[in-house]
């Protein structure tokens, strides 16, 4: 890695989403929304298994925590930090697992009739994306 790439443009010691979750947790807002464990109060067994630290910050998307579909604050900042860390122009956080991430990647890069080089053992999410966009595997 070149010396140039080891210097980050942004402060990589930040954790914007975690910091926002901690600020929200300290507000002690009473949950009337999903998830049903109500930050552990509604399911003591789950809290015992995962720990209060985990369930205490497992909350639904709300304004202080930004919105993954249209990030404008802490999620956008986290994406910018990730892009900076990887030396990329952009980075996008995903919550749908590998399948939605792979499909998003293929659907972004390919359109009907495009050829895409793929190995025989691709994940089925790639095949699904090919069906959706009409690209041709070669």
Language-model features: locations:
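N-terminal active-site wall of soluble small-molecule enzyme domains
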Residues: 104
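Glycine-rich helix-loop-beta junction characteristic of Rossmann-like nucleotide cofactor-binding loops
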Residues: 84-85, 107-110
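N-terminal "arm"/small-domain region of PLP-dependent enzymes with the aminotransferase-like
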Residues: 1-73
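Conserved PLP-anchoring active-site segment centered on the Schiff-base-forming lysine
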Residues: 109-130
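Conserved N-terminal alpha-helix of the aminotransferase class I/II PLP-enzyme fold
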Residues: 52-100
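Short, structured coil segments at secondary-structure junctions
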Residues: 133-134
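Short acidic loop-to-helix transition motifs that present clustered carboxylates
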Residues: 98-101, 123-125
């Amino acid at each position: 890695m070149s010396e140039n790439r080891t210097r980050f443009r942004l402060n990589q010691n930040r954790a914007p989403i975690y910091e926002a979750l901690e600020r929200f947790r300290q507000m002690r807002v009473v949950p009337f929304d999903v998830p049903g464990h109500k930050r552990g109060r509604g399911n003591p067994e789950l809290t015992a298994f995962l720990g209060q630290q985990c369930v205490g910050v497992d909350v639904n998307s709300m304004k202080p925590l930004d919105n993954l579909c249209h990030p404008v604050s802490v999620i956008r900042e986290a994406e910018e930090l990730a892009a900076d860390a990887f030396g990329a122009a952009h980075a996008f956080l995903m919550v749908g697992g590998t399948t939605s991430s792979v499909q998003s990647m293929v659907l972004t890069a390919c359109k009907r009739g495009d050829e895409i080089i793929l190995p025989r053992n691709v994940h089925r999410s790639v095949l699904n994306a090919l069906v959706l966009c009409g690209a041709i595997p070669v």
